[in-house]
Regions:
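Conserved beta-strand elements of beta-rich interaction domains across eukaryotes
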Residues: 84-85, 90-92, 138-141, 161-164, ...
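Conserved catalytic/acceptor-binding region of the Class I
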Residues: 201, 222-317, 321
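Short SAM/SAH-binding signature in class I
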Residues: 189-198, 224
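A short glycine-rich, Lys/Arg-flanked "PGG" loop and its adjoining helix->strand segment in the class I
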Residues: 207-222
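Class I SAM-dependent methyltransferase SAM/SAH-binding core
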Residues: 127-188, 193, 208
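N-terminal auxiliary segments of SAM/dcSAM-dependent transferases
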Residues: 2-98, 104
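C-terminal lobe and adjacent flexible extensions of AdoMet/dcAdoMet transferase-like proteins
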Residues: 3-9, 278-367
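Conserved alpha-helix/loop element of class I SAM-dependent methyltransferases that forms part
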Residues: 97-132, 142, 146
Length: 367
């Protein structure tokens, strides 16, 4: 069994605050520029493709095997209560909206995690000369763009189910449409680093995800996974069992069971277990408590909490909507009232809520 290290950073934060995102059908896509921590990207050059022998423009699409059929219907969005979601065709339904409101929330969450890591984009000890990077479930692409800016010598590829990424990107960054749950078509030993973040409720087989990442990595390469728990907690009992925050988390966990795509990655320790099963070594774990709201006395944690609350409130209804229809199955008007109650609860200065989160990185053994 691989050694697991509890990183010392996981113990630095006070108990009241913090302790402690595959490859196939390719196409670069467009969306509004990020709203938080914006970079100054340039128009992308023609990007190199996976096998270096079939052209792939940074503003166009081509296809590859296995998941290539995704490309024919990527814009065939489904609409739920006026919000757009990724197409259900090909069995790749995802619970989050893919419209501008939700995307802004995702970008704010990126800012939260960057603040949490003291301005860093990763926890793994990466070489500055890193060459090829994969961002699985890239979302708006903000992490991939920022990473490409910070590591101009690296080729950064972000993959997602929805084409919501920006057109204007650094020349060393590109985006591809892909379902990470389908067999990966990357040749073995392609990447130096694979970044996986906030895929809760979207992966049915976490061990398989890490096995595919293991195969796609070069010997000595790193995989990194950052996932929140599906819960709102408090150390002083201010988040009660009947709180709307608690009931919201319970709804998500139940929805994960019903869909077969768990929200319990943190509580079930799926990151560490999956990495161990895949064959990774030097597994390092960092646990965090991200405050919800500005309640912590520590200025940095208070700022993080403000942004976290802003991220949640930015699209609280959109974040609830899919699971509400799946689990609760009551009129949408009731969901909106429930969202109001959750928002009100978060804003109470006496509620000291936080969300447990876990960053895990590990290395593929040298050949």
């Amino acid at each position: 069994m691989a050694d697991v290290t509890q990183a010392p950073e996981a113990q630095r934060q006070p108990a009241s605050a913090t302790t402690g995102e595959a490859s196939a059908s390719t196409k670069t896509w467009g969306a509004p520029a990020p709203v938080i921590v914006p970079s100054e990207p340039q128009e992308s050059n023609e990007a190199s493709n996976r096998d270096d022998d079939d052209a792939d423009s940074s503003l166009g699409y081509d296809t590859a095997s296995t998941t290539a059929s995704l490309s024919s219907s990527i814009m065939d969005y489904r609409t739920i209560h006026g919000r757009t979601y990724h197409s259900e065709k090909h069995g790749t339904a995802y619970w989050g909206p893919n419209d501008e409101r939700q995307n802004e929330a995702l970008d704010i969450s990126h800012h939260v995690l960057t603040l949490l890591l003291d301005g860093k984009l990763h926890g793994a000890p990466l070489n500055k000369n890193i060459q090829k990077v994969l961002d699985v479930g890239t979302g708006t692409g903000i992490w991939a763009v920022d990473f490409a800016d910070e590591y101009p010598g690296a080729q950064v590829i972000g993959t997602d189910l929805s084409p919501i990424q920006p057109y204007w990107i650094p020349p060393n960054c590109k985006f591809e449409i892909d379902d990470a749950e389908l067999p990966w078509t990357w040749p073995e030993g392609t990447f130096d680093y694979i970044h996986i973040r906030y895929l809760l409720g979207s992966i049915s087989d976490w061990p398989q995800l890490f096995k595919q990442a293991f195969a796609a990595l070069k010997p000595g390469g790193y995989v990194e996974s950052f996932e929140p728990d599906a819960s709102f907690e408090s150390d002083d009992g201010s988040v009660t069992p009947d709180s709307p925050l608690t009931r919201w988390a319970q709804m998500n966990r139940e929805g994960g069971k019903m869909s077969g795509k768990p929200f319990t990655i943190y509580s079930d320790n799926l990151q560490v277990q999956g990495m161990q099963e895949a064959g990774f070594t030097d597994i390092t774990v960092k646990n965090f408590k991200i405050p919800v709201g500005p309640w912590p006395a520590d200025p940095k944690l208070s700022e993080i909490g403000q942004y976290e609350q802003y991220a949640i409130e930015q699209d609280i209804e959109g974040t609830m909507m899919f699971m509400w229809d799946l689990v609760i199955q009551k009129p949408i008007e009731e969901m909106r009232l429930f969202a109001m109650s959750a928002r009100k609860e978060m804003r109470k200065p006496t509620v000291h809520a936080y969300i447990p989160q876990r960053l895990v990185y590990a290395r593929k053994p040298e050949a």
